[in-house]
């Protein structure tokens, strides 16, 4: 496994739209392992393939205290969103910057795991926020896009 280079804002590649994965082969599995290593090395809780300059719909997340419960989401799609919550967010592609972002409190998604099996996932709280943040990366959106400009 290896630590991958993370694209930093304002790199225009962060705005690219990711494409679906049609086959989960050894190359994709290797990418996922490297993404996890990169996320853990950089002390993040989520990473989208877009952030490592691979424009595929892959997300890795681990919000566990001991960093031992990785969640892999391939081709994730929102099924439902409800409620509202605000979390202070940061991003490995925008180092040392944070902002409070309003997002849905609960989300339900459909995704594929590393074995190619489709599954549904309901989440709330921090996990729901993390999923929404990382899924934004797949459509070229960053958390700073939610920040309203200051008024004079």
Curated annotation (Swiss-Prot):
Removes the formyl group from the N-terminal Met of newly synthesized proteins. Requires at least a dipeptide for an efficient rate of reaction. N-terminal L-methionine is a prerequisite for activity but the enzyme has broad specificity at other positions. It comes from the Bacteria. SUPFAM superfamilies: Peptide deformylase. The gene is def. PANTHER family: PEPTIDE DEFORMYLASE. InterPro entries: Peptide_deformylase (IPR023635), Peptide_deformylase_sf (IPR036821). Belongs to the polypeptide deformylase family. Its EC number is 3.5.1.88. One of its GO terms (biological process) is translation. The active site is at 134. Binds 1 Fe(2+) ion. It catalyses: N-terminal N-formyl-L-methionyl-[peptide] + H2O = N-terminal L-methionyl-[peptide] + formate. Its cofactor is Fe(2+). This is Peptide deformylase. GO terms for molecular function: metal ion binding; peptide deformylase activity. Gene3D superfamilies: Peptide deformylase (3.90.45.10). Fe cation binds at residues 91, 133, 137. It holds the Pfam family Pep_deformylase. Keywords: Hydrolase, Iron, Metal-binding, Protein biosynthesis.
